[in-house]
């Protein structure tokens, strides 16, 4: 089967425990969903040169990943990276190279620290909930100073009630 023009691939919930080494046949792949499988690692050759500019969305949630292959940081157009509910104990240094990353989720892992270059990211959405982060781990996360005030949950609830009246 020739898949050279494939843009989106969803192999979620298939009990996949290993991936093939050769992903060179998917040069136009922009979205890869491998959630709810049994992956414990990713092939070192998975993020090939042909995919480095096309892949924008990766969902590896609900697997058994213990480490993240640093080759993922060569994906220059990666915008969404979902790693929720794995067994990750760290995020490798180099994540700051993902200059187009806007959504990063890694809830429900075993993360204790964040890499020093984490503060280079310009995220719109970040979820690190349910991790045993050390007290000093989130120091790389600096609040956005763009003049935007985020309302409290109480204020949002009050607005919702007011709008329903």
What do the predicted segments below correspond to?
Residues 1, 19-22, 42-47, 65-71, ...:
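The feature encodes a structural signal of leucine-rich repeats
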Residues 137-165:
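Cullin-RING E3 adaptor/co-adaptor recruitment helices
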Residues 3, 26, 50-53, 75, ...:
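Structural signal for repeat-unit boundaries in curved repeat scaffolds
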Residues 1-36, 42-49:
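Core solenoid repeat modules with strong leucine/isoleucine-rich periodicity
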Residues 94-133:
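Repeat-solenoid scaffold signature
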Residues 8, 21-24, 93, 103-106, ...:
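Short amphipathic alpha-helical molecular recognition features
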């Amino acid at each position: 089967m020739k898949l050279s023009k494939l843009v989106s691939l969803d192999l979620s919930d298939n009990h996949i425990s290993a991936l093939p080494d050769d992903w060179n046949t998917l040069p136009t792949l922009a979205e890869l969903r491998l959630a709810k499988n049994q992956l414990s690692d990713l092939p070192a050759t998975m993020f090939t040169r042909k995919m480095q500019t096309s892949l924008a969305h990766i969902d590896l949630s609900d697997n058994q990943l213990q480490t993240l292959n640093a080759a993922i940081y060569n994906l220059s157009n990666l915008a969404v990276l979902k790693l929720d509910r794995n067994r990750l104990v760290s995020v490798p240094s180099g994540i700051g190279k993902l200059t187009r990353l806007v959504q990063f989720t890694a809830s429900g892992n075993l993360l204790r620290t964040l890499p020093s270059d984490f503060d280079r990211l310009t995220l719109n959405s970040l979820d690190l909930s349910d991790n045993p982060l050390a007290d000093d781990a989130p120091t790389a996360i600096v609040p956005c100073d763009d003049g935007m005030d985020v309302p409290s949950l109480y204020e949002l609830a009050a607005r919702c009630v007011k709008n329903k009246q």
